[in-house]
Each structure stands twice: as C-alpha cells, then as structure tokens.
Curated annotation (Swiss-Prot):
Belongs to the HSP33 family. Redox regulated molecular chaperone. Protects both thermally unfolding and oxidatively damaged proteins from irreversible aggregation. Plays an important role in the bacterial defense system toward oxidative stress. This is 33 kDa chaperonin. HAMAP family: HslO (MF_00117). It comes from the Bacteria. GO terms for biological process: protein refolding. GO terms for cellular component: cytoplasm. Under oxidizing conditions two disulfide bonds are formed involving the reactive cysteines. Under reducing conditions zinc is bound to the reactive cysteines and the protein is inactive. NCBIfam families: PRK00114.1. InterPro entries: Heat_shock_Hsp33, Heat_shock_Hsp33_C, Heat_shock_Hsp33_N, Hsp33_helix_hairpin_bin_dom_sf. One of its GO terms (molecular function) is protein folding chaperone. The gene is hslO.
Length: 286
C-alpha cells in the first residue's frame, strides 16, 4: 500500500526541481467526515495534493491555506496545512452537484486565495481567478503571477486516493526553459493509475530514466486537526454570556463541533461559569 508520502527531487543537469505526492489515509480523513458528492471528493483530493506540493516549496516554518471561493453551488473549498505537511480541509456546497461539473459549474465566478503565514514575519496572500479549466492550471497561474518561474502541476484524485506532481525552474542566470519543456513533456505521460499504485522511485524511473535525478528523503504527510477544547472555550467566550446561558438553560449544555474532523466538545453549567470567570473549562467532557 502506498503511504502518504511526498518526495522532492532535482534534475542536476537542468536546474529544475520536482515533487511527487501520493495520498490515501489523509485524503480519506478529509472527505470521510462529510457526505461530499463524488465531484467534490475529487476536487478536495486534487486540492489536498496541490496544497501538499505547495507546502513543500515553503522556505519558512508556518502555515499555508489554499482556498477556493465563488458564487456557485460550492461556496468554499479549503485545505489548511503547515510546513510539517500536516493538512486538514473542508468544503461547503448547496444542492446536487453533477459528477462532470467543471470548476466554473461548481464555483461560478470564483477565485483562489493562497495565504502563507510564517511563524515569524509578515503574512503573504495571493489571489487568482478560477478561470482555467483545471485546478492545476489555476495553481500554475498563481506561480506565474507570484514567482514568475515556469511551473507545472499534474493533479489526480478518484475518491480513494489522490496524487500530484510538480515541476519548477530554479532561479538561475541561465535559460533552462527548453529543459523544463522537455521534462514537462515526459511528466505529462504519467497516468493516475501509475501514481496510485507504484512506488515513487518506480514512477520517477519510468518518467526520467534518461535524466540525472537526485531524490531526497521522503516526507510524511498526515491529516491533523488543530481543534481543541481550549479553542472551543475561547470561541464561547466571544459570545455574549446571556446568549450562552440561554442555550444552557434550554439544552442543559453547550456543544461545539469542529467542521474539519467532527469532534464534539460539550460544556456544562460549571464549565460555562469557569469560561466567563477566567477563560478556562474543565477537561472532563468531550
């Protein structure tokens, strides 16, 4: 079974870098907590793979968010992650979605927002329109606008597994566009089934057996939600106390749910009193 792994590699004779990611468990954890329509399962798989590939390009410790928004039946699809390849995501939609719906069908007049938040330093945000036929092409458009380095992506998902590949010219005084185009032609021959079933080394050998490829140590990718009882308590404290106490009087408890992982945090009267007294709550219920 292919594990959730990202591989980075370099073409020593071309000043081009590459990445390959294969996802299963993390993908299932993202889509398993909601009854997503098939087309949305596939979109989230592609978005998860794209975010993992983007995360591997970060040169800092911090977080990344890749968010799709629009005025169509899908109002939001987002994957959040960290430089440690810890990812989570959700989507919101209304009504039935056709299995063959395009990005335009799903989002209408949509756009993609990529937010980079370093642990230290200023946040960066880039926005591009969802006006290309594929998510991969939209991400390429982001790189063309933000980094102005030739970049190409290939994204695949089938509701069970997700995978992706990434190529980018490294900053250099020399022109390596011809090498990049050649490597893109080789990479474009990849099939989803190969990425879903073959080990990364076998995939790279099949694609680039005549190239000088340097493969780096693999990086584990995982689903990780950042919700907690403490964060839920902090969210409750932002609500007017009278409103919370009204809920408590009617239901006997206040329940907070996480959209990402479906965790439930339950607070009783003693907890609520403690939250408004000093911002803490007991850890006895979840």
């Amino acid at each position: 079974m292919i594990q959730d792994i990202l591989h980075r590699y370099l073409f020593d004779n071309a000043d081009v870098r590459g990445e390959l990611v294969q996802l299963q468990d993390s993908y299932q954890q993202v889509i398993g907590s909601h009854a997503y329509p098939p087309v949305l399962q596939i979109l989230l798989g592609e978005l998860l793979a794209a975010t993992s590939l983007l995360t591997a390009t970060l040169k800092f410790s911090g977080d990344i968010s890749v968010q799709l928004q629009g005025n169509g039946p899908v109002s939001l699809a987002v994957i959040n992650g960290s430089n440690q390849q810890q990812l989570r995501g959700i989507a919101r939609w209304d009504g039935e979605l056709a299995d063959d719906a395009s990005l335009a069908d799903l989002f209408g007049q949509g756009y993609m927002v990529i937010t980079l938040t370093p642990d230290e330093g200023e946040r960066y945000q880039g926005v591009v329109a969802l006006d290309k036929p594929t998510l991969a092409a939209c991400v390429e458009d982001y790189f063309n606008q933000s980094e102005q380095l030739p970049t190409a992506l290939w994204l695949f998902a089938d509701g069970k597994q997700a995978a992706g590949m990434f190529l980018q010219v490294l900053p250099s005084q020399e022109d390596h566009n011809a090498d990049f185009e050649h490597l893109c032609q080789l990479t474009a021959t990849i099939k989803a089934e190969e990425l879903f079933t073959l080990e990364a080394q076998e995939v790279l050998h099949r694609l680039y057996h005549q190239e000088d490829v340097r493969l780096f140590d693999p990086i584990e990718v995982c689903f990780k939600c950042t919700c907690s009882r403490e964060r839920s308590a902090a969210a409750i404290k932002t609500i007017d106390q009278a409103e919370v106490e009204a809920i408590l009087a009617e239901d006997g408890k206040v329940e907070m749910g996480c959209e990402y992982c479906n965790a439930k945090y339950v607070f009783d009267g003693i907890d609520i009193a403690a939250i408004y007294a000093n911002g803490t709550a007991s850890n006895t219920q979840q």
